[in-house]
Design a protein with these regions (language model features):
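Extracytoplasmic/periplasmic domains immediately adjacent to an N-terminal transmembrane anchor
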Residues: 187, 206, 278-501, 666, ...
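Conserved ABC ATPase "signature" region
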Residues: 118, 122, 130-146
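Catalytic Walker B motif of ABC-type/P-loop ATPase nucleotide-binding domains
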Residues: 175-178
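Helix-to-loop junction immediately C-terminal to a conserved catalytic motif
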Residues: 69
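Membrane-spanning alpha-helical segments of multipass transporters and channels
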Residues: 243, 341, 348-359, 370-375, ...
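Conserved ABC transporter NBD signature motif
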Residues: 77-95
Length: 697
């Protein structure tokens, strides 16, 4: 069964020195800090041949492959792949010209087989007709189950075959397969090798395959043995065995390793057992196997690209962004429980804030010591007026009342003297009275001040009750009991609003921001851990395209969350909105996008879920406390207030309050400043995340 191979799409013909090889590595070094993974490595992959790359775990095979496909930069040396350096502007490596199958499979478990292949076909720009033809061929060739089968439900061998199918999908000119036949049925393994041999016969497809089945590598045209970041041997399998008088390839490689250890050679040994120079020149023996390319030193071709090509290479491709966007939305669709939870969580949170924050305390027990016994006394009239829904009066003796407060049973004590009524009348009528009369005509209050909100509420209720009591007793002369300070009607807002009115706008922004952080903080971490990011990089996806796709997909989620929150706070809890609803929505959406951007920074910078979660939670409380969401910024001491004003939500919270409660628009500085600060932080986080992601790839 055959499939047409994709034609090379190079902008210029291969240089003369490079036209006979697919990959040429010269003096390649790669280090991670002080650890040298690749040390002056030289490797040549002939055009149109299968190259078996063998070596123990940790010898540098995966690092070398990442350098070849352009997702990892080399510290020193030169690499050319299909005539040009990897990641060269206009060169589709990484991109459509390379098919990559990583060892860890790197598949989306929520996808079906068809979803997986369609996703990569969108990345590579295949037409729908081409995609269907290739999909049908690969499903039949790789003996895969029905294309609607979920990857999560497949066996390990079936998943490996799906991963191989994704690598073969676009008929690449270069195939890099990392352990493609592990866990695969022997019959199917033979069939896969037969297909690989068949597609290289045209001379247009070159294959690098790594395997720990050493004898299986005998089917390759050329084998190379890596150890400690060096290439010990590179020749046809039969040549290697003959030169070491071995009947098996495994035994020949064992001899090479022993020889390398004995000689202490760090740059490897040739198949003949001698030390290798940097050129690592080997003799080719056509009668012993397929010809090997000359390892004589060649001049590295200088590739140049004009500014138009570089600009085109840097600009994000809408096709790839759309593919990544559809991928993310499809994964969300396949997890309906998680999606519903994401939609309901902000509604639950804002409902709890509106219901539980800012209201008056209820059922506060207060001990009452009333030494007046007359039913018509002023003390009984005043106590009758006191708000009984908030304050529960418990009549007690003086000693019992204070004992109860000391035990924590009551929040305070109200005390009335036995002559409270007569002394209060004297205070109102007589011009001069003694201190004893003033004291006896006063309500004595002892409060537990450990809870400031309850203590302030008790004082407020007592003052309101006394004002009502005085008005009832003085009639038209009630103004005598008024304070000389008169609070007029508010310019903005109303006098009967509670603390929840202050908290709610900031809470909406905070919930939107941190739910967006939570949505994205683990996205790159999990995809990097599962190898999905690396596979996308090799397919030609850039960091900018990845960022934009995540941004757009998460924007859909937070848009639904914002709509549900606004419905609840405006229609259910009747929060006032005197300004433009579009400005309210715009500011909340911008805060959500800023949260997404910050989550992407965390996800790009962190390597594991625990670190990402700690980073997200670590900034939650400082930002909540310092941003003026639960307490005014004016209460923050000045050295710390400068930090508060620099945070993303401080000015934004103030701007949202101005829009909702004052009805202000963008002409007011307090409003447009909130938008400007939010936009600035959003741009900063996006650029930072893109830079971090690019540096880490």
């Amino acid at each position: 069964m055959k499939e047409g191979d994709a034609k090379p799409d190079l902008e210029a013909s291969l240089p003369a020195a490079q036209g006979d090889c697919a990959i040429r590595c010269r003096d390649v070094c790669r280090s991670y800090g002080k650890l040298k993974v690749l040390s002056n490595l030289n490797l040549t992959v002939p055009q149109g041949q299968i190259y078996g790359l063998l070596g123990p775990s940790g010898c540098g095979k995966t690092t070398l492959l990442k350098c070849i496909v352009g997702t990892l930069k080399i510290s020193k040396g030169h690499i050319t792949v299909l005539g040009k350096p990897p990641a060269f502007p206009g060169h589709e490596i990484p991109g459509k010209m390379v098919g990559y199958m990583p060892q860890d499979l790197a598949l989306y478990n929520e996808f079906t087989i068809s979803d997986t292949l369609i996703f990569f076909s969108r990345i590579h720009g295949l037409t729908w007709k081409e995609t269907q033809a290739r999909m049908n061929f690969l499903i039949e060739f790789l003996d895969l189950p029905q294309k609607q089968s979920i990857v999560r439900n497949l066996s390990g061998g079936q998943r490996r075959r799906v991963s191989l199918g994704a690598a073969l999908l676009q008929n690449p000119e270069l195939l890099i397969l990392d352990e493609p036949t592990v866990g695969v049925d022997p019959v199917l393994r033979s069939k896969i090798w037969q297909h690989l041999v068949e597609i290289v016969k045209t001379g247009k497809v070159s294959i690098i395959i790594t395997t720990h089945y050493i004898e299986e590598a005998r089917q390759a045209n050329v084998v190379g043995l890596m150890r400690n970041g060096n290439l010990l041997a590179e020749s046809p399998p039969d040549t290697v065995m003959k030169l070491h008088s071995s009947t098996t390839l495994e035994h020949a490689f064992l001899q090479l390793c022993e020889s390398s250890d004995q000689n202490g050679l760090k740059q490897g040994t040739s198949p003949q057992g001698g030390p290798l120079e940097n050129s690592q020149s080997f003799d080719s023996s056509r009668d012993e196997g397929l010809p090997i390319l000359s390892r004589e030193a060649v001049e590295v071709p200088k590739c140049t690209a004009d500014w138009k090509m570089r600009a085109k290479h840097m600009l994000p491709k809408p096709r790839i962004i759309a593919a990544l966007f559809i991928k993310t939305m499809l994964r969300m669709k396949r997890m309906p429980g998680s999606l519903c939870f994401q939609f309901l969580l902000p509604v639950i949170q804002i409902s709890l804030i509106c219901l539980c924050v800012g209201g008056d305390p209820r059922g506060i027990q207060v001990a009452v010591v009333n030494n007046e016994t007359s039913p018509s006394s002023y003390s009984k009239a005043l106590l009758a007026i006191l708000d009984n829904s908030s304050i529960m009066q418990v009549p007690l003796s003086h000693d019992k009342a204070f004992e109860g407060v000391y035990k924590g049973d009551y929040w305070g004590v109200l005390g009335f003297g036995e002559n409270f009524t007569s002394y209060l009348n004297k205070r109102m009528v007589q011009k001069t009275v003694s201190r004893a009369v003033v004291d006896g005509g006063s309500v004595h209050v002892w409060l537990d001040q450990t809870n400031q909100q309850i203590a302030l509420m008790l004082q407020k209720k007592l003052h309101e009750a006394f004002q009502t009591f005085a008005a009832s007793k003085l009639g038209s002369m009630s103004y005598i009991a008024d304070l000389p300070i008169k609070i007029e009607e508010p310019i903005y807002g109303s006098q009967n609003k509670d603390f929840s009115t202050f908290v709610t706008p900031g809470a909406v922004l905070s919930i939107t921001f941190y739910l967006a952080v939570g949505l994205t903080a683990l996205s790159f971490v999990l995809e990097r851990k599962e190898g999905l990011l690396d596979r996308c990089w090799v397919a030609g996806v850039s960091s900018v395209e990845t960022m934009l796709a995540h941004l757009f997909s998460q924007l859909v989620v937070i848009s639904v969350q914002i709509c549900l929150m606004l419905i609840f706070i405006l229609l259910v809890f009747k929060m006032p909105n005197e300004g433009s609803l579009m400005l309210v929505i715009s500011l909340i959406v911008m805060q959500g996008v800023t949260g997404i951007s910050f989550g992407l920074v965390i996800s790009a910078a962190m390597d594991d879920e625990q670190s990402a979660n700690q980073a997200a939670l670590g900034v939650f409380y400082p930002n909540l406390i310092l941003s003026g969401i639960i307490w005014p910024v004016e209460c923050i001491p000045y050295p710390l207030r400068y930090l508060s004003l620099a945070l993303p939500q401080t000015y934004a919270s103030e701007a949202l309050r101005c829009i909702m409660y004052r009805g202000w628009g963008l002409s007011q500085m307090l409003v447009w400043r909130g938008f400007a600060i939010t936009l600035g932080w959003n741009s900063f986080f996006l650029i930072l995340a893109t830079v971090i992601l690019k540096l880490r790839t």
